[in-house]
């Protein structure tokens, strides 16, 4: 009896250990000039790929990494876009059409098929640029993580856009010029805007991530992003892919209005601030799980 119990306990421990996948950190040469740093976890067959936003890195998705570590259904990937985090600081290519090509190369080199694709913030432009150039045949579902489909509108408080055309709040100029002229000020303001609870420790940690992106690259990717408009590309996915728009609380009404007009089948959830998936990871991950339950 004691031997049987011991064998049962050993079996349970081994089963648990085998079902848990630690985060693996790897590098991948995706073309002649770019080597991408990426992380992966989980033991499933369905790939999920999340793309970080402007100046950010894989570190922002650490709580999603933990969430999927024991998954037997999904394998979760995230990577540092060109010029960000630990990926190559290339001389050129710092615009979103090229980011879309980089994403294509990343998926191709790893052989990832029928991907659940998510983009946070300006990372939404990465995934939409990929879909514009290569189509959506390799995409199982699309998740916009507080990512707007275009940059400019009449009013960035009432429309699902990043900037007002007149830049009345000065945000476009700040993220371009303050990045060059006063990086510490920009970091503090940017990180503070992203957080519900901007403690000194959180601001310092996230500012360190921001600063992995050189100022000239950060300024260029902010300004090139200001010209992007992927509304037609996102709208064209209606009825073709499951869509999830997870946005910060103050973008809930604009995102729902846009979805009602263009993608009525989309699931829209709103809560917290720009880093809601990091600060309120349990709430975000629960919503993500519910959405994934509808994806086949």
Language-model segments: residues:
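Conserved alpha/beta-hydrolase catalytic His-Asp/Glu region
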Residues: 153-154, 158-160, 174-236
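Active-site loop/oxyanion-hole signature of alpha/beta-hydrolase fold enzymes
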Residues: 31, 75-122, 272
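Flexible "cap/lid" loop of the alpha/beta hydrolase fold
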Residues: 128, 139-177
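Conserved loop-alpha-helix segment in the C-terminal half of the alpha/beta-hydrolase fold
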Residues: 240-278
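Post-His helix in hydrolase/transferase enzymes
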Residues: 278-293
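Bacterial N-terminal signal peptides
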Residues: 8-19
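N-terminal cap/lid segment of alpha/beta-hydrolase-fold proteins
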Residues: 23-35
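Conserved HGGG/HGGXW glycine-rich cap/lid loop of the alpha/beta-hydrolase fold
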Residues: 34, 40-89
């Amino acid at each position: 009896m004691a031997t049987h119990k011991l064998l049962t306990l050993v079996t349970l421990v081994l089963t648990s250990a085998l079902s848990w996948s630690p985060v693996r950190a790897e590098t991948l040469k995706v073309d002649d000039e770019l080597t991408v740093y990426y992380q992966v976890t989980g033991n499933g067959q369905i790939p999920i790929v999340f793309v970080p936003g402007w100046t950010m890195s894989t570190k922002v998705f650490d709580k999603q990494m933990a969430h999927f570590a024991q998954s037997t259904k999904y394998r979760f990937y995230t990577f540092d876009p060109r010029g960000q985090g630990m990926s190559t600081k290339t001389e050129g290519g710092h615009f979103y059409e090229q980011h879309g090509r980089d994403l294509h190369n990343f998926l191709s080199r790893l052989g990832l098929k029928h991907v659940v694709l998510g983009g946070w913030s300006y990372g939404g432009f990465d995934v939409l640029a990929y879909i514009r150039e290569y189509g959506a045949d390799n995409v199982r579902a699309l998740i916009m993580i507080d990512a707007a489909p275009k940059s400019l509108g009449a009013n960035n408080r009432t429309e699902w856009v990043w900037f007002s055309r007149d830049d009345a709040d000065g945000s476009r100029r700040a993220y371009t010029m303050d990045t060059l002229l006063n990086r510490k000020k920009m970091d503090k303001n940017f990180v503070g805007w992203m957080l519900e609870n901007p403690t000194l420790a959180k601001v310092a940690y996230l500012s360190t991530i921001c600063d992995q992106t050189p100022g000239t690259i950060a300024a260029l990717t902010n300004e090139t992003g200001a010209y992007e408009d992927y509304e037609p590309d996102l709208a064209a996915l209606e009825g073709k892919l499951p869509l999830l728009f997870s946005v910060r609380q103050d973008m809930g009404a604009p995102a729902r209005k846009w979805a009602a007009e263009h993608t009525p089948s989309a699931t829209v959830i709103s809560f917290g601030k720009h880093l809601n998936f990091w600060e309120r990871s349990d709430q975000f991950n629960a919503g993500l799980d519910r959405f994934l339950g509808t994806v086949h």
